[in-house]
Design a protein with these regions (language model features):
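A detector of single, family-specific signature residues
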Residues: 1-234
Length: 234
């Protein structure tokens, strides 16, 4: 007899509910949000052949890959569609939501969502962190330009090392403004150093991936673009 399992995940605990093919509740409980204790309870109360459903969320990739690694049949469900179905419940609790997910798995009224590999998520995190620092350097350079323009000092349209040198040259004759601008410029330099660290990590990742190496043979394709495209497809 097939069993169906619903998981309602929060940061610390996960509510688990097991139902049979008739919709009868067989077991319901709570355990720590970790693949090992969750898989142990599912195997004990539902069996390794049970169909398990979990909503999309920030912790979903880690849990799904961990549970699949334990041999469980786990489906990731679109949270927006699940929310519409669970809104019909009178009492909204984690345990009831887990039972609702189990019933959705039983009826088959769900849309499975692809869960990208952990390697793809690592590439995405790397590119996201780099993008944040690039945005911060842009905002800092714009602020430096704005402060200098207020006092008639124009660094021009240079970027990178050229911008750095122009600002330093302008500050030599304006010590009062240097008190404000130099700390900003020092922070800007540190951010660029960290961006260079990320760039090196991206290139290492590209060299280790045969697909990325192949894409890099296309003219004008950069390591950042190749990593973004290959990571989004996994």
């Amino acid at each position: 007899m097939p069993h169906y399992v619903g998981l309602d995940v929060s940061q610390k605990t996960t509510a688990i509910c097991v139902v049979d093919e008739q919709g009868r509740r067989l077991w319901r409980g709570v355990c720590a949000t970790d693949p090992e204790p969750i898989s142990a309870r599912i195997s004990k109360y539902a069996g390794v052949d049970a169909k398990v459903g979990v909503e999309t969320g920030s912790m979903t990739p880690w849990l799904v890959h961990g549970l699949r690694g334990a041999g469980l049949n786990v489906q990731c469900l679109d949270a927006r569609r699940v929310k519409a179905a669970l809104q019909m419940q009178l009492n909204k609790t984690d345990e009831n939501d887990a039972e609702g997910l189990a019933q959705i798995m039983r009826t088959g009224w769900y849309r499975a969502v692809h869960v990208k590999s952990l390697d793809a998520h690592r590439a995405r995190a790397l590119l996201g962190a780099r993008a944040q620092l690039v945005g911060m350097t842009t905002r800092l350079s714009n602020m430096i330009r704005g402060v200098l323009k207020t006092f008639g000092l124009l660094p021009g349209a240079g970027r990178g090392l050229r911008f750095d040198r122009k600002v330093e040259a302008l500050l030599e004759g304006a010590p009062e403004i240097a008190l404000v601008v130099r700390p900003l410029l020092a922070t800007w330099r540190q951010l660029r150093e960290q961006i260079a660290v990320f760039d090196k990590a991206v290139l290492q990742q590209v060299r280790a991936d045969p697909i990325c190496r192949l894409l890099m043979t296309v003219p004008s394709y950069t390591g950042i673009w190749v990593t973004r495209r290959s990571g989004g497809a996994c």
